């Protein structure tokens, strides 16, 4: 049953917000004065964790009650029509990284804090009483007071208007949703510039960071705003776009209009020592959030079931914009290794959500943020649309969309209607089959009676219920074929004639931009494999990708995949190496640690990587290509897994040389040097040294490298010490806990310790990060590691009674299937796969 929307009772038009924060008392108080139109005499207004002292309607005090089963109050307004509702309240500062909360950091060993906000999805109600629903757009005037110290900076969605009696007044916002309101204050460092159209661009951090760490993202943000204004043909509507890095932040970033907030790792980097991959990551996060300033902020989904409208489009636009800003990066290749891979794996599990999901109960909202579906799959859908339309038609349709819906709300069909005006294709009809249905098809391509035929059927990894789903599939063939496959079966005609006309092996989904995989019969596959080494990198990646997925779904055997790896071991493309080692890594599940199969698999890794390591060496070279720079990490990691003695020796020698200056070690190789040192030369002293550096450094990339190494310890005593840090926020921040937990759990020597910890500390974990939309991914992490019947049974014993939690329900059920499939796959394939690996070593 649908839960009543508060917007049905009251339409806010403008908020006058007064908020007084007392950091010393860990609390705040204020008045939320809401101008709007009362729709029903009993008005519902959201609040959470608040003490409400008084409510007035048009200056007259009225009765109110707290909801028993919802986060809000019922106000007996006694009237309908235009009114002003004023609510006096107080509330605590939280330590959940939601609502208004402190972030903690150190400068020269001195502990400091910065106050910031996070209101998406439903946390504005923790900061001020409001109608906390996306459709309830209004303007906001913020007056902010706090226990201010000299030298502190205050930021909000809009520029500051004036300061009177210690109160900071900010200019009125444009119409926007409550979840986009933001403010922050504390000691900050900043850099600013202006776009060609005059928009103020700023990057802000704590003073733990140097000015040079802000330069890269400032440049990206400036050029991104300029690009979007041109591409959307719609001006950026605010006078400022400020980017703020918060030391504690639950998500990756948040698109608050005019004041975008980020996890430090996704905004700040040292331009003198960072990887190209990290530059790409920061650039795509910044451009993703700035794409939201139009898609999400200017035009907002009516309700959370259209979350994809915000996230999927921003996810596509981050790549489109970075490709324009830095064409030499070939950023669409990163789309193939991250978005495509994530979506195709997740979307093959029965029970997965569709991109567009009906959601009625607000308690279900945070469960919608499935990164592999709403972000990755959704963006693949929009890449399909872009491919069908072309950029000019896309821009024309988007301008129409923004012109019609700016400062308002929209649903998916509004976008399809706008885009369809720019083409003769029925975009909505095509896209509904992808957005409203979970899963995706495998297209079987085969020669029968001399004809090339295609069939489509939903693809599953593990058990799946076939319900006859059908998709409108853009075939993207490299031969004469229909643009769209609408039917379950398709006869394309005489195979030999098609082959002769094409002059090359016949393939589907060229470019890997449509959301399906292909299973070729032996005739077609043999033809493709003859040309495999001459295919472009994306096609080679796709070949490995589809073989891996088919093997996971038991429509092919991993034993047959093993010989294919050899074909690509000397590829100089980093995305092919990504696909190669992603596929090879899947073979690890069949080789128990310390077994003969494990020994053979490591030897195979050494064979696959040794020529590349010899070609590239450990140390980056002046003038080497971006491809070589990005390929080196894959082959070094593979070489170390393969226990190549020369690689282990070189890595140790590099560590010794940089032992007293590890921060200066090239970021391109630093994680592998550190991991090698911990795995092969580990000690309590080394662990203590690395965790000391972890706590002392403010460089997010260096922190990640140190964490990746520390969790690789093979010593049970050291691992127990590491696990003991999980609840110590002075060492492991809650925002980073999942990464630490995942690292120890993925370590065979630490798996039991981490599994015991999460079961023992579940109540604490839920209290600490349970309100985070990414809380469910702790379960995802577990499903990626477990592979035995015993672990499957333990998983069920622990998680079954937690299915009543709406945030966790789908994840628990899906990951149960993921583990069950892995257990079944290992049982049926292990002997054949390990035999194939052994055979590959004899060649």
Swiss-Prot record:
Cofactor dependency: Zn(2+)
Residues at the catalytic site: 289
Keyword Oxidoreductase part of the UniProt annotation: no
MF term (GO), any: zinc ion binding
Stored CDD domains: M1_APN-Q_like
Subcellular location: Cytoplasm
PANTHER family reported in the protein's UniProt record: PROTEASE M1 ZINC METALLOPROTEASE, PUROMYCIN-SENSITIVE AMINOPEPTIDASE-RELATED
Family: Belongs to the peptidase M1 family.
Name of the protein in question: Aminopeptidase N
Gene name for this UniProt entry: pepN
């Amino acid at each position: 049953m649908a839960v009543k929307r508060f917007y049905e009772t009251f339409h806010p038009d403008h908020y006058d917000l007064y908020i007084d924060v007392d950091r010393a008392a860990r609390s705040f108080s204020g008045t939320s004065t809401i101008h709007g139109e009362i729709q029903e005499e009993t008005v519902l207004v959201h609040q959470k964790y608040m003490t409400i002292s008084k409510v007035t309607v048009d200056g007259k005090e009225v009765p109110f009650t707290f909801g028993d089963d919802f986060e809000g109050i019922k106000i007996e307004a006694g009237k309908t029509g235009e009114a002003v509702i004023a609510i006096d309240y107080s509330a605590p500062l939280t330590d959940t990284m939601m609502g208004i909360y402190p972030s903690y950091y150190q400068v020269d060993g001195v502990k400091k804090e910065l106050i910031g906000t996070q209101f998406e999805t439903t946390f504005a109600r923790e900061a001020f009483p409001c109608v906390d629903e996306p459709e309830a757009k209004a303007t906001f005037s913020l007056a902010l007071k706090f226990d201010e110290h000299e030298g502190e900076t205050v930021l909000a969605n809009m520029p500051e208007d004036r300061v009177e009696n210690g109160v900071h007044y900010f200019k009125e916002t444009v119409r926007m949703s409550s979840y986009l309101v933001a403010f922050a204050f504390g000691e900050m460092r900043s850099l600013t510039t202006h776009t060609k159209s005059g928009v103020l661009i700023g990057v802000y951090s704590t003073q733990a960071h140097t000015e040079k760490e802000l330069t890269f993202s400032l440049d990206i943000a400036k050029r991104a705003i300029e690009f979007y204004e041109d591409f959307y043909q719609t001006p950026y509507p605010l006078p400022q776009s400020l980017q703020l890095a918060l030391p504690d932040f639950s998500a990756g970033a948040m698109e608050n209009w005019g004041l975008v907030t980020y996890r430090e790792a996704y905004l700040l980097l040292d331009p003198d020592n960072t990887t190209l991959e990290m530059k790409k990551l920061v650039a795509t996060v910044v451009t993703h959030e700035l794409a939201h300033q139009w898609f999400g902020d200017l035009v907002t989904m009516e309700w959370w079931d259209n979350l994809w409208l915000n996230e999927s489009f921003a996810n596509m636009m981050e790549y489109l914009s970075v490709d324009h800003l830095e064409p030499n990066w070939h950023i669409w290749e990163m789309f193939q290794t991250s978005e495509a891979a994530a979506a195709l794996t997740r979307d093959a599990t029965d029970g997965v959500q569709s991109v567009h999901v009906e959601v009625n109960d607000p308690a279900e909202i945070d469960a919608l943020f499935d990164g592999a579906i709403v972000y990755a799959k959704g963006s693949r859908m929009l890449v399909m649309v872009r491919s069908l339309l072309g950029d000019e038609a896309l821009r024309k349709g988007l301008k129409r969309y923004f012109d019609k819906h700016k400062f308002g709300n929209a649903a998916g069909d509004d976008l399809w209607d706008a885009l369809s005006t720019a083409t003769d294709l029925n975009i909505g009809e095509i896209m509904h089959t992808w957005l409203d249905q979970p899963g995706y098809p495998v297209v079987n391509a085969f020669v029968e009676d001399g004809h090339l035929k295609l069939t489509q059927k939903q693809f599953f990894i593990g058990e799946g219920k076939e319900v006859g789903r059908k998709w409108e599939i853009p075939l993207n063939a490299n031969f004469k074929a229909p643009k769209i496959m609408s039917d379950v079966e398709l006869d394309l005609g005489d195979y030999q004639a098609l082959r002769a006309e094409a002059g090359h092996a016949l393939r589907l989904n060229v470019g890997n931009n449509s959301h399906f995989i292909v299973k070729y019969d032996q005739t077609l596959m043999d033809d493709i494999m003859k040309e495999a080494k001459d295919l472009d990198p994306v096609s080679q990646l796709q070949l490995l990708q589809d073989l891996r997925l088919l093997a996971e779904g038991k429509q092919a055997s991993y034993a047959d995949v093993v010989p294919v790896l050899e074909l690509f071991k000397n590829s100089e493309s980093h995305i092919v190496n990504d696909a190669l080692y992603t596929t090879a890594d899947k073979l690890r599940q069949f080789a128990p640690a310390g077994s003969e199969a494990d020994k053979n698999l490591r030897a195979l890794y050494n064979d696959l990587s040794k020529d590349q390591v010899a070609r590239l060496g450990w140390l980056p070279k002046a003038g080497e290509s971006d491809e070589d720079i990005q390929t080196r990490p894959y082959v070094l990691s593979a070489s170390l897994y393969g226990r190549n003695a020369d690689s282990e020796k070189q890595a140790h020698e590099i560590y010794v040389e940089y032992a007293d200056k590890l921060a200066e070690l090239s970021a391109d190789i630093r994680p592998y040097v550190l991991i090698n040192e911990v795995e092969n030369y580990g000690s309590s002293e080394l662990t203590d040294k690395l965790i000391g550096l972890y706590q002392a450094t403010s460089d997010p990339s260096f922190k990640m490298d140190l964490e990746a190494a520390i969790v690789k310890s093979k010593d049970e005593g050291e691992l127990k010490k590491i696990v003991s840090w999980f609840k110590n926020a002075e060492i492991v921040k809650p925002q980073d806990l999942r990464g630490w937990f995942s690292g120890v759990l993925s370590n065979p020597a630490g798996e039991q310790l981490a599994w015991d910890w999460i079961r023992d500390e579940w109540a604490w974990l839920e209290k600490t990060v349970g309100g985070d939309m990414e809380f469910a991914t702790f379960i995802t992490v577990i499903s990626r590691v477990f592979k035995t019947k015993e672990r499957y049974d333990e998983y069920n014993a622990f998680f079954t009674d937690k299915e009543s939690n709406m945030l966790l329900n789908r994840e628990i059920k899906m990951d149960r299937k993921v583990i069950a499939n892995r257990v079944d796959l290992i049982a049926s394939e292990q002997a054949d796969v390990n035999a194939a690996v052994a055979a590959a070593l004899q060649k």
